[in-house]
């Protein structure tokens, strides 16, 4: 043992479903892609996984659900408010608007 510090990031440990990867890229609140780029991303991912015959069907089923998941994730600051975490009203308002925006995008898909 050399005494050096080693960090293992278990957050990305294992395999992810390509459908989830494709969808999360579109839904992540940090992404500010226009509709043309999002469509291009999905088209390219579909081509990459063309041999996966269930990819498109799984994507159609999962994509709106994963959008709702992200709409809930951005609301996490509401869970920690009052638990010693100093979350401002401004932050909560911003997160609520992000969630509403994601829900509106999901609504357009269903």
What are these regions (language model features)?
Residues 72-110:
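ATP/Mg2+ or Mg2+-diphosphate-binding catalytic cores
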Residues 1-21:
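Active-site acidic catalytic loop and adjacent metal/ATP-binding pocket
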Residues 17-53, 64-83:
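Active-site activation/catalytic loop segments of kinase-like enzymes and analogous catalytic loops
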């Amino acid at each position: 043992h050399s005494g050096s510090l080693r960090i293992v990031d278990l957050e990305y440990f294992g395999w992810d479903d390509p459908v989830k990867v494709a969808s999360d890229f579109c839904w992540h609140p940090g992404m500010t892609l226009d509709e043309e780029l999002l469509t291009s991303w999905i088209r390219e991912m579909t081509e990459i996984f063309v041999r996966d015959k269930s990819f498109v069907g799984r994507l159609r089923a999962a994509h709106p659900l994963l959008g709702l998941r992200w709409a809930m994730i951005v609301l996490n600051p509401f869970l920690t408010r009052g638990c010693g975490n100093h979350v401002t009203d401004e932050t909560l308002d911003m997160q609520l608007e992000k969630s509403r925006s994601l829900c509106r995008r999901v609504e357009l898909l269903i």
